[in-house]
A protein has these predicted regions:
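Short hydrophobic alpha-helix segments
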Residues: 17-18, 49, 98
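Unchanged
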Residues: 63-149
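Short loop segments at secondary-structure junctions
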Residues: 10, 41-44, 51, 111-116, ...
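Charged phosphate-binding loop/patch that engages nucleotide di/tri-phosphates or the phosphate backbone
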Residues: 150-164
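Acidic, metal-coordinating catalytic segment for phosphate/diphosphate chemistry
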Residues: 1-36
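A glycine-rich, hydrophobic loop/mini-helix early in the fold
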Residues: 32-64
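A short local loop/turn or secondary-structure capping micro-motif enriched for an aromatic residue
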Residues: 22-25, 54-58, 152
Length: 164
């Protein structure tokens, strides 16, 4: 059972928690936090194919922020768990938040020009991630048009990544 802190629309933590899978939130007033991490090396971004159990869709790395954790801390946890990749804190940059139905998504950019796209190896968590692919912005926009990029990932792309 995963316990999550509850936040107001501005991202301020309220004196309340809820249980993942059984969210008890006042619509439009209370939210949980999710974190996502966009990896960029040169002109390419890392997108993962989420496992079949999780919906078989393309998305960025991320997850729920549990009680007592910050989104920055959880960004590191999610990357370690899902990709087997330890983030260098100096290269992890908060770029903003997106508010969606019942969630506030804290969006981070991990930029590392030294990643060799042909050589980097990820140790994927099979329950979460089927595979990963490095894409250009044009390739992501094509996926958005085809409807094969998770809606929240497409939303983050349009708000923060497209014009970078």
């Amino acid at each position: 059972m995963e316990i999550l802190d509850v936040y107001d629309i501005k991202g301020n933590k309220l004196d309340k928690t809820t249980v993942r899978g059984n969210l008890q939130l006042k619509e439009g007033e209370e939210f949980i936090k999710i974190v996502t991490v966009w990896f960029r090396s040169g002109i390419r971004y890392l997108i993962q194919l989420v496992s079949k159990q999780k919906g078989s869709e393309y998305a960025v790395t991320g997850g729920h922020v549990p009680t007592g954790s910050t989104s920055r801390e959880q960004a590191k946890v999610e990357c370690r768990e899902e990709l087997g990749f330890d983030l260098d804190d100096d290269k992890l940059k908060f770029i903003g938040s997106v508010v969606e139905t019942r969630v506030i998504i804290d969006v981070y950019l991990y930029e590392d020009e030294d990643i060799d796209l042909e050589e980097v190896e990820f140790n994927l968590q099979e329950e979460e991630v089927e595979s990963v692919v490095w894409l250009t912005k044009d390739e992501m926009e094509d996926m958005i048009l085809k409807g094969i990029l998770r809606d929240s990932t497409a939303h983050q792309y349009m708000v923060y990544i497209k014009d970078m």
